[in-house]
């Protein structure tokens, strides 16, 4: 068995000694044609479909990015709109509270004013009643003083006679 390997090795060395680096015979153009056919087949079966898949994927990613940016912008707009509406509602609530407080203060002020007016009227009425009673008491006293002074005068005059 070793004999055959040695024989084959010597034959291979003898054949290479004849030619140089390349043999310019019919194999070179056949190899070039084979390479071109292989390149065309690879281009047709492998590179174009992969290139198309890459382009499709790139378009898909680009479209999704644009959609995502639009959705993000829409979400930001909605958030801003929500915050503006929330501020408006809070402002309206504060206005309603302020109006209610002002109205309550007005009602309290009206009630206090009414109570003060009523108390003043009662006081004036009481003062008038007191004045009327005083006048009547003075008249009564005056009548009693007159009658008593007449009685005293009659007793004094009657005692002198």
From Swiss-Prot:
Instruction: List the GO terms this entry assigns under cellular component, sorted alphabetically.
Output: plasma membrane-derived thylakoid membrane; proton-transporting ATP synthase complex
Transmembrane helix: is it a keyword of this entry? yes
**Does the keyword Membrane belong to this entry?**
yes
What is this entry's stated membrane topology?
Single-pass membrane protein
Just give the chief location class: membrane
GO molecular function: any one? proton-transporting ATPase activity, rotational mechanism
Concerning Pfam families, the annotation shows: ATP-synt_B
| Domain of life of the organism encoding this protein | Bacteria
InterPro entries reported in the protein's UniProt record: ATP_synth_b, ATP_synth_b/b'su_bac/chlpt, ATP_synth_F0_bsu_bac, ATP_synthase_B_chain
The record's subcellular locations are: Cellular thylakoid membrane
**Transmembrane regions:** 30-47
UniProtKB keywords: ATP synthesis, CF(0), Hydrogen ion transport, Ion transport, Membrane, Thylakoid, Transmembrane, Transmembrane helix, Transport
Q: What quaternary structure, including any partners, is listed in this protein's UniProt entry?
A: F-type ATPases have 2 components, F(1) - the catalytic core - and F(0) - the membrane proton channel. F(1) has five subunits: alpha(3), beta(3), gamma(1), delta(1), epsilon(1). F(0) has four main subunits: a(1), b(1), b'(1) and c(10-14). The alpha and beta chains form an alternating ring which encloses part of the gamma chain. F(1) is attached to F(0) by a central stalk formed by the gamma and epsilon chains, while a peripheral stalk is formed by the delta, b and b' chains.
Q: Which family does it belong to?
A: Belongs to the ATPase B chain family.
What this chain does, per the entry, is described as: F(1)F(0) ATP synthase produces ATP from ADP in the presence of a proton or sodium gradient. F-type ATPases consist of two structural domains, F(1) containing the extramembraneous catalytic core and F(0) containing the membrane proton channel, linked together by a central stalk and a peripheral stalk. During catalysis, ATP synthesis in the catalytic domain of F(1) is coupled via a rotary mechanism of the central stalk subunits to proton translocation.
- Protein name as annotated: ATP synthase subunit b'
State the organism of origin. Picosynechococcus sp. (strain ATCC 27264 / PCC 7002 / PR-6)
Its organism's taxonomic lineage begins at: Bacteria, Bacillati, Cyanobacteriota, Cyanophyceae, Oscillatoriophycideae
């Amino acid at each position: 068995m070793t004999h055959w390997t040695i024989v084959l090795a010597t034959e291979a060395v003898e054949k290479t000694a004849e030619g140089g680096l390349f043999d310019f015979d019919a194999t070179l153009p056949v190899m070039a044609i084979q390479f071109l056919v292989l390149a065309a087949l690879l281009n047709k079966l492998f590179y174009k479909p992969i290139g198309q898949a890459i382009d499709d994927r790139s378009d898909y990613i680009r479209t999704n990015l644009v959609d995502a940016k639009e959705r993000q912008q829409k979400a930001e707009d909605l958030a801003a709109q929500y915050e503006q509406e929330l501020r408006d509602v809070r402002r309206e609530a504060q206005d309603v509270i302020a109006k209610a407080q002002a109205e309550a203060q007005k009602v309290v002020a009206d009630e206090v004013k009414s109570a003060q007016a009523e108390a003043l009227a009662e006081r004036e009425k009481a003062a008038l009643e007191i004045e009327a009673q005083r006048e009547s008491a003075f008249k009564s006293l005056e009548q009693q003083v007159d009658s008593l002074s007449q009685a005293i005068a009659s007793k004094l005059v009657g005692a002198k006679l």
